[in-house]
Amino acid sequence: MEEFQGYLELDKYQQHDFLYPLIFREYIYALAYDHGLNRSILLDNVGYENKYSLLIIKRLISRMYKQNNFIISANDSNQNKFLGYNKNLYSQMISEGFAVIVEIPFSLRLVSSLEATEIVKSYNLRSIHSIFPFLEDKFSHLNYVSDVLIPYPIHLEILVQTLRYWVKDPSSLHLLRLFLHEYYNLNSLITPNKFIFSKSNPRLFLLLYNSHVCEYESILLFIRNQSSHLRLTSSGIFFERIHFYEKRKYPGEEVFSNDFPSAILWFFKDPFMHYVRYQGKSILASKDSALLMNKWKYYLVNLWQCHSYVWSQPGRICINQLSKHSIYFLGYFSSMRPNLSVVRSQMLENSFIMDNAMKKFDTLVPIIPLIRSLAKVKFCNTLGHPISKSAWADSSDFDIIDRFVRICRNLSHYYSGSSRKKSLYRIKYILRLSCVKTLARKHKSTVRTFLKRLGSKLLEEFFTEEQQILSLIFPRASYTLKKFYRGRIWYLDIFCINDLANHE
């Protein structure tokens, strides 16, 4: 954010919280163009970069106020190549640019909070894989876990109202409301969950959804911190502190005192409650009894319904013992597997044999959902038998091999933290054989004949990818290399879940 602060002239607009002047700045859409839109698609339009000007942006925005906006006729498509490529291209540009503008207050608050608390920025914590070492370290001491699907708003106006607390610019909010009303059908009674996380325009909707979730999570964090701080306080003093909270003017405390009875705070005196969220799913885990977990569950439901105005069914939130339940999270099946070890102790003439039971965090590759994902994109059938990718048969041999290798490399990279590699090897086998069948189909030959003619060098990249990466990490230790190749490795450069791994 520091790189763009001077360029965007934020100091001038930040004084009055005005964001709408930035809508007419060309470099905002250049940033959105670089970050959000597909460069190869846009450059296919003849003369796109020459027509990308402030006049074009103003014309695009003015179309939003017309009666038949967002509808382009065939004549318009022929006259304007910029708008003729895709009917929704200009609306996507406006939404991407608007998302960049609305992100400014959030980014500035984040930078100021980091500077105030003197927190050193750690870019490694952005990685999805950084969550798993936390689970591995904390979950071994916990007993109960609950999978929670975060409810999404049934009306997009709720998202706009939530954003109002962060963005103090009415003009920008009116533009957002108009945009949602005209293009995304604001009056729809039901907003599908997949629509919020869709790839058609993820930046704007992820911003709105995350601001909505951030609001209730801030209240959850406040209650969690206060309940942990007052864990040993007697109930009488505790209720006195509640009345004291009502007199203070913190947003989380006001919401809490207005929406919930004071006695409910007594339920949450648990210092071992852990909360993890990614996209629309969260995990609650605790060391205490199932009764306390059940109270936390109903607290979340009341928080969603009374404050966030979203409906949730308590019966769909299940509480399970961590030792007997697998958690499906971030494309992994995670569980706590008991690891039994026998220890022999000898003291003088007496010897003792003790069974030592320890919990081990186990992460598995979900083979069945992955095969379904591969079958959906035509790499195999529903039974997992490899088939040729007919859509790629017209490409060159190099492009076909490169595509398969990149998919296999990404899956191996993402599932490097698996405790057991057998399922991952099966997925790689499906991709390798599908690649060979695609090449054989292109050359009108059988798989056996094609392999005999080209030999084993054809698929060397499939086999050597992990060894090459690990040889850079452990260049002189062959035993360590083999050990880590079989074990778990968490990478700190994975910023989004793999498409094939996202089965939800």
UniProtKB/Swiss-Prot annotation:
Whether Plastid counts among this entry's keywords is yes
Which GO molecular function terms does the record list?
RNA binding
The protein's name in its UniProt record: Maturase K
Family membership noted in the UniProt record: Belongs to the intron maturase 2 family. MatK subfamily.
Which Pfam families is this protein grouped with? Intron_maturas2 (PF01348), MatK_N (PF01824)
Q: What does this protein do?
A: Usually encoded in the trnK tRNA gene intron. Probably assists in splicing its own and other chloroplast group II introns.
Cited InterPro entries = Domain_X, Maturase_MatK, Maturase_MatK_N
Places the protein is found: Plastid, Chloroplast
Please indicate which superkingdom the organism of origin belongs to.
Answer: Eukaryota
Picking any one GO biological process from the record gives:
RNA splicing
Question: To which species is this protein native?
Answer: Adenostoma fasciculatum (Chamise)
- Keyword Plastid listed: yes
**Which keywords describe this protein according to UniProt?**
Chloroplast, mRNA processing, Plastid, RNA-binding, tRNA processing
Which Gene Ontology CC terms are recorded? chloroplast
